[in-house]
Amino acid sequence: MKKISNILLAVTFALPLFTACETDNDSNPILNEPDTFTLNTPAYAANNVYDLKNAQTVELTCSQPDYGFPAATTYTVQASFEQDFIEATDESKANYTVLESTSPTAKINVDASELNNALLDLWTAVNGEQAELPTEPVAVYIRLKANITSSGKGVCFSNVIELPNVLISKSTSSLTPPKTMFIVGSMLDTDWKVWKPMAGVYGMDGQFYSMIYFDANSEFKFGTKENEYIGINDNRVTVTDKAGAGVSGSDNFVVENAGWYLFYVKAAVKGDDYQFTITFYPAEVYLFGNTTGGSWAFNDEWKFTVPATKDGNFVSPAMTASGEVRMCFKTDLDWWRTEFTLHDGEIFYRDFNLIDSWTEKGDGYSIQGSAGNVIHLNFTAGTGEKK
């Protein structure tokens, strides 16, 4: 077997995330639709082995697509064993794999385990279930897809780069992403007896979310099952506070600032255990679709008002047109991954491949709105209504 040396644990693409801002003039920016953008070849790619089993991340860097103005951009990693990426047709599958995790910046820390598993699946798809995995490094080709965040606009693809020495390995762990996630704490009940189940992010195994009101200095823990009690001091846990919640603690999580937050948990398999990433997002709920006159982006004109109390209602702006009501939370993901509706007066979180309408789920899942209607949502009670 070829000796593996100089194991590279990170590969590099870099560029800060630019976001649109107001200018001194009243003109609207004009969207340029670029054909491509530059993905950088790592400086030492030719002489190093990317051992995905023993690496943590593969770091990539690229230039931002030229949209004609600074725009928040989402990057998706695609990988193939062939230099020419071939799209799927009615007769054949695509010859590349797409990683589920995306990046909001042009410096992308690709999870090595996720890349390894994606390449394993692609190898099996190309060579058959009985095909042996190569014991020596193989060439892997990478490209990026970019689009303007939370929209279908500005889609373009980077150039293809080669990583000539990538070692992929069979997973030695039988652990799979958790199917459930719960949160418990003083903001739910003072006796810590209520284990609140969280909604699963559609299409993202091991990821969960819940809109929760935290009293000032609330304390809580979470778990993949009831009575697991995972705290902030667990070395498997990292916390990102994007909402100014003021998260701290030495055992229990402590939320300093009272208010509504979207609590988000990502559980990733790392060997024989999980790594948990906790994110606090602002409590942002939006109307989408036909009842807004056709808005399919996070437009603050269609953001719900946030109540000041635990038992208050989130209230939508008045609809301006007729059609099916579409609602979602704002995270770093595509809007439809955290979409929900109302069914028999209760909030129902998307759990299926919705193509065009909630009618595909069954009777009573599609809310039909008209001009002047508003939606009231009570996330503490888990209920809602159209008025």
From Swiss-Prot:
It is a lipid-anchor. Keywords: Carbohydrate metabolism, Cell outer membrane, Lipoprotein, Membrane, Palmitate, Signal. D-glucose binds at R326, W335, R350, D351, F352, N353, L354, I355. Changing N252A: Impaired binding to starch. Abolished binding to starch. It comes from Bacteroides thetaiotaomicron (strain ATCC 29148 / DSM 2079 / JCM 5827 / CCUG 10774 / NCTC 10582 / VPI-5482 / E50). Pathway: Glycan degradation; starch degradation. Induction: By maltose. It is found in: Cell outer membrane. This is Outer membrane protein SusE. Residues 174-283 are annotated as: Carbohydrate binding module (CBM) 1. It comes from the Bacteria. Residues 1-20 form the signal peptide. Monomer. Interacts with SusF. Starch-binding protein present at the surface of the cell. Mediates starch-binding before starch transport in the periplasm for degradation. SusE and SusF do not constitute the major starch-binding proteins in starch degradation pathway. Has higher affinity for starch compared to SusF. InterPro entries: SusE (IPR025970), SusF/SusE-like_C (IPR032187). One of its GO terms (molecular function) is starch binding. Belongs to the SusE family. One of its GO terms (cellular component) is cell outer membrane. GO terms for biological process: starch catabolic process. Changing K221A: Impaired binding to starch. Abolished binding to starch. Residues 284-387 are annotated as: Carbohydrate binding module (CBM) 2.
